[in-house]
Amino acid sequence: MLTTTKVVIGDMMRELVYYVAVSIDGYIAAPDGSYDAFPVEGDHMAVYLSDFADALPAHVLAALDMHPPGNRFDTVIQGRASYDISRAAGIERPYAHLSEFVATRSKTTPPAGVTFTADALTTVRELKQQEGLAIYLCGGGNLAGELLPEIDRLILKRNPVVLGDGVRLFGNAGAVVQ
């Protein structure tokens, strides 16, 4: 059975929320970055669709004939590897209903509506000072490790899956944050 753990780590007006599926051994993806070991059907989907629909990619919302409620997130930040999964599937703006930021050092020009940032920490700090809803930290683990001091809320979708290896929840972050 899937369980959800909510941990509040701060009291900011605009939060950075790391909402992520995780195996019971602490991995958010397989070594190749795939996440198909995590179930997409089951009781947890009711919570996802009712409380976290803003965190669904735009193409998934369209397939479900849903409109994003716009009541939880208005911005998403993700790492380049996470973003490239969508790009490989031909999806230029996976979260077209949100302001999209991608942490990357690439000098390529992003598609319209997507902002590339080489300094995710500064970008998140600036976003948190602006009016708006919460900021969805979509992944991956290395970006989460980099942004760990700024994460205000951690929502783990713990899955009864053991991956044994892969992308860790906070990448290779070694710092202790309380």
Question: Residue spans of the language-model regions?
Answer:
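Enzymes that bind and transform nitrogen-containing heteroaromatic metabolites
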Residues: 2-178
